[in-house]
Every structure is written in structure tokens, then in C-alpha cells.
Amino acid sequence: MSAFPISDIGGSWEYSHAPPTATSATGIPGFPEQSVGGLQLPFPGYTYVGASPLTQPRRHFPNSTPVLGNYAGLSSDREVIATSLNPYISKFSANAEWPISDIHQSKKSVYIPEERDVSNQFQTDKQQQQQFMKLPDPQMQVQLCDKELWDQFSRAGTEMIVTKTGRRMFPGYRIKISGLDPTAKYCVMLDIVNVDDHRYKFQHGEWTVAGRGEPHLPQRFFLHPNSPANGSKWMSEIISFHKVKLTNSIGRDVDGKIVLNSMHRYQPRVHIVRTDDISSVHMQRLCTFAFPQTVFITVTAYQNSEVTKLKIDNNPFAKGFREDGARAKKPRNQHNHFSDNDTSPYSEQRRSYYEPGSYTHLPYYNNSPMNVPSHHHYDNQTMNREFLPEAKRNRIMPESNSIHAPSLSVFHPGNENAVSQWQDVPDLNEMYNANDNNYNSVANQSIHNVQYTQNGITSHSPVQPVPHDNSFTYYNSSSPSSSDSNQSNVNASFSVMTTTHASHSINDIMRISEHADVTSPNINIPNTVETNVHSSDSGIGSSPPTPSDDDASNLIPGTEEIFKDDGKVLDGENLPDMSDLISLTERKESGEANANSHTEDFSRNPACQSGDTIESKDIQTLQVASVTDTYSYQKNYVENSSHQSYNNSQEFSYHSNAMPESNCESSVDPNLDWESNLLTM
């Protein structure tokens, strides 16, 4: 164990070289002939421990004066202290060894070293000494590139980001080398050492010492990927260490990364080794260069705003943070926060469907199988169709707030099994614009008739017989023709259409009949048929009319037995079949008809109940609904010459427990009793 004189520790550190010794073989100041165990020590000033590099002094080197290498081996455990060119290592004589001696017996804890000449302990081998003491390249010079940029950062206080995954340095460490042997092989390395043992903090716009720093990790060298290479190659290009990454995490993936502690000051250094074998770099002579303006402080986030501005203005990868960069604020319009020329998927063309203020809730689509009623009831009737895009207008079907949503399936050839409006839905634009943009308009298409009301209720009526399955019953309807204008007979056909879809609620049917704009042709029924039906004020859903015994003469011939059973009038609950009720619609009151009138909801229109004349010229739709099941009875009248006025209600709602489930047209013979008619259905 060796010790330094206590009286000399407080002396000043000088940057002058030690005087040449008498035993110097090369004439270089501070390089005496030394050997330990027969091995010459070419670079005095370092304590050599095997082949591992020494920890450099924790003081900032004032200039870029090269520091001679520190790689050599020892065959002995003897510690040698020598004079060095580096004043930060030692300023004491290399020929003095300070042994431990006991001079003061009373103070055994105090030891005064005794100087002793140990020069005779070194064996001299001039050939080996010349080999190790020769400088690799005395004319070698290193120039720092981007010196002006480094000076700007140095004046502001350079900060480097360290992350767990590693962050590259900016400004990048780039150098230019000269004075090498063009034919010799060289390896270039980079390491980063700590400047002092302090931890820093940024306070009040400047960096101050915050306490003692954390223990520093062993140094790691970053070997340039082009190593080894000829001297001519190194001198012909700029050497860049832009791939070096700074990290604060010790992990397995440390290739190309240098581990540093945050909030500490560090100094990058460049080492040049003359060798052609990478595996023996640590055993070869090297030259080290350092530049004072490259000192930086490691941070996890930039502390100084001036440094941040310099990084943004000079780093090509930080263009997005500039005022005119991609992350700069752009003017936004009031609709979609995008410019008119923006091709973003959230542009106005695609976002108009979600324009705020058009409706209160998002649209609800009833696309459940078999139209199973959903528990989500959104107020879609307040929806403004003007905000809907073209694609959505052709697909969305408004729905009511009733428990059972109306069926939205379209019945036409090729779509018999449709259970959802997404399979085939008519163009609502055509229906909306069918009659001067009136909601109460009818779009008579080639395949089916669609009635679109203002309340958002739609109904579909096929006009041609199409193939059907067990789920649907189609009916045949006749349209008026000019060729049959002279015919005087009345063709009336009844059919029953049953479906497995969700049934219409009573309120839906009432809205359909209330806002329907479907007209029927003028019908002429013989005046011998008289009608005396007592309508209830309740309209749809009320009890059926019960004619008295005196009214039997006014019934349609052949229907007296329907209302007579052992001299008792049948009430609505005992009616055996809905087909019997159809005959009630045959009771008409003759009168003169006026042209261009509309069919109204007779059960709810006071004018109709009071006996006013109502005319019709197109198709009259009669629907009979029950509470449990809904059956649409539609009656088509074709009239060619005369007119017929109607009185009283044309829609009935009865309770029936015996509803015929038939998929074909039913023909009711008025000359038969109700039991025979039931069998024929």
C-alpha cells in the first residue's frame, strides 16, 4: 500500500510537464525507463490492472490535448506510481515509493511515508522499451465538425435526452482525422465519461449543484462500424457517431448504447488505436481526444427553453415542432375542423351524417333477425333527412317508438326471404320527391307501392303476383285500365296476407290510415245494397256493430244468418271468423260521387261519420287488425264508369280467437252461411 505526503495534497494542480529524468531513453519528458517483472511500462501515470481500462479523472480536461493510452498488462501485483503527462492523474515523482513506517509510537494511526529509491528494481530492455515508448502517430490531429453549432449549445448549456430504449445525440458527434499512416490499420472508438461527482438541477434559469452524484457505471466503448480501416479511408471522410444512443437503463439489449445517469455532466471522448485486430484493441497503444464544448448534462426532458429552441431549429427530425411544421396549428372551419382541400377520412363529406343539431340521437337500425323487437327506442322521427348523405338516405328507414316496429322488408321477386331492411330497401329520395316533395305522397314503382308518411311509417304493397313461401301470402290486385272503361261490373277480390315479421301495433295502423294518400277508383255498387252500420266513437279497436232484428232486411242478401243464431244477435266476441266481417264492407249507401277526393280515416273523420260524400279513384286499402295478430285485408275495387260514395267506417278491429292461417286467396260466398264460408277458406 502506498500513500501520498499529506503536506503536498493541498498544492496547486499544474498543467506543465514533468522534467525529463536521467534514465529517459527516448528523450520524451516524463517517460523514464520503467519495468515491472521484465515488462516495460510505456505510458506512465496510470495504475495498470490487467487488461482493463482505468477510470479517468473526474475533472474536465481544458483542451483537446491528446492523452496517451492506458492499456497494458502487468505480470506483478506491485503498484507503481510514475510521473504523467496528464496532470489529473498524479504530480508526484515516479521514482519515490512511500512505505509505511512507525515513527511516532504514541500515534500508531498516523503514518509518515519514507522516500526510497526503487529505480534499481526495474529491469532494462531497450528494444522492448523503444517498441512501447514510440508514439503511434506523432502528427495525428482531430478536428471537431459542427464546431459553431456545438458552441451555441455550449453557451446555452447542452442537454441530452436519455431514455430507457435509448436516444441519439444532437448535435451529432462528428470528427475529421488527419496525420495518419495511409497504409496502416486503425480503429476508432467513442466513450463518454463523467466530468464530476455532482448531481445538477435546473433552477431559476440555470444549472446548479443539487448534491452528490450517483455511482457511475463502468465505461463502455462504442466501436465505429468501419473499424478497422486504412488511414487513407479515415482521413478521406467525416467520421460520425450518430448511431450512439444514450440510455439510463441497464438491460440485456445494450448494443450501441451507453448507460448514463440523468442530471449529471458528461464528456465524450474519441480514441484512435493503431491495430488491424479488433480483439486486441485493449492491448494496443491509443490516442484520446476530447473537446470542451461537447460537455453536456443528461436529462429526461429538456429543462432550458433556449436549448429546446436550438434543437427544433437545427434538428432536421424536429420539423414537426416548428411554426410552419406538420404539428403547427392550422385554421379550422366551423363544421368539421378540416380545410376544404383536406382528404382526411373525417372530411365534411363523410362527417355530415354526424352533424350536430340534425337530430337528438344517433340513428337506430332495426336489423335484428326476423325483426325481433328491440328494447332501444330512439326518437328517430325528429331526424332531419337533409343532413343525411346520399348513401345513408337510400338505406335508413325511420321507425316508430312503438314496441313493435313496422316491418321494413320489401316484397318483390328475388327478395322473398328478406328479413331486414339492409337486404333491399327502396330509394327514399324517389319516394320523397314523388309528388312535389310532399310527405303524403305515393311512389308507384314497377315492383311495389311504397307509402311514406310524415310520421315515418312505411308500408309496402306488391302490385304483381310473385312466388311465395310459407312466410308470406301474396294477393293479386287489378289496376284500372282505359280499355275496360265501359264495363259496369265491379270486380272485388279479397286476400289475406300473413307474415312472420313483427306485427303492426294499433297505433301504427292508425297512423297509416290517418296519413294515407292512397285513393281508390270510383266504384259503383247496385243501389239495392243498403248499409246500416253503427260505428263506435272509439274508431279502430272498438266493438263491432251489432244490428238489431229490424235491421236484418238491410243486410246483404245471404248474410242474415251471420248475425242470426237461434233468434239472437251475435256480438263481436262470438263472431266465428274474420271472413264474416268482410261481408260487412259490402253494405254501401248509394249516392253521387265527386271526383278528385281523398280517402280518409273513416273511423276517425267526423265528416265521414256524419254522412258526407267521400270519393276515391285509385286503390282502397282496408286493413283489419287484432290485438294478438295482425292481418292485412286489402280490397281492390276496379270501377270503370260510375261512382260510388261511401259512408261510415271502412276499417274494423275485432277480437278473434279463430283466425284462419291461409297462404292463398279466400273467396267468400255470400249465399252460404258462415260455417260454409269458414270451410272454404
Curated annotation (Swiss-Prot):
Instruction: Name the InterPro entries on file.
Output: p53-like_TF_DNA-bd_sf (IPR008967), T-box_DNA-bd (IPR046360), T-box_sf (IPR036960), TF_T-box (IPR001699), TF_T-box_CS (IPR018186)
Which PROSITE patterns does this chain map to? TBOX_1 (PS01283), TBOX_2 (PS01264), TBOX_3 (PS50252)
Function in brief: Involved in the transcriptional regulation of genes required for muscle differentiation. Binds to a palindromic site (called T site) and activates gene transcription when bound to such a site.
Q: Which GO terms describe its cellular component?
A: chromatin; nucleus
Question: Which biological processes are named by the entry's GO terms?
Answer: cell fate specification; positive regulation of DNA-templated transcription
Q: Which domain of life is it from?
A: Eukaryota
GO molecular function (one): DNA-binding transcription factor activity, RNA polymerase II-specific
Which keywords are on file for this protein? Activator, Developmental protein, DNA-binding, Nucleus, Transcription, Transcription regulation
Tissue expression summary? Differentiating muscle and tailbud tip.
The protein's name in its UniProt record: T-box-containing protein 2
Biased composition range(s): Polar residues: 521-534
DNA-binding region, residue range(s): 149-323
The taxonomy runs: Eukaryota, Metazoa, Chordata, Tunicata, Ascidiacea
Assembly and binders: Monomer.
Q: SMART domains given for it?
A: TBOX
Q: Where in the cell is it found?
A: Nucleus
Chain spans, region Disordered: 316-351, 456-489, 521-558, 589-611
Q: Give the main location.
A: nucleus
- Please name one Pfam family that this protein belongs to: T-box
- Spell out the Low complexity composition-biased ranges: 470-489
Q: Has UniProt tagged this entry with the keyword Ubl conjugation?
A: no
Q: Which organism is it from?
A: Halocynthia roretzi
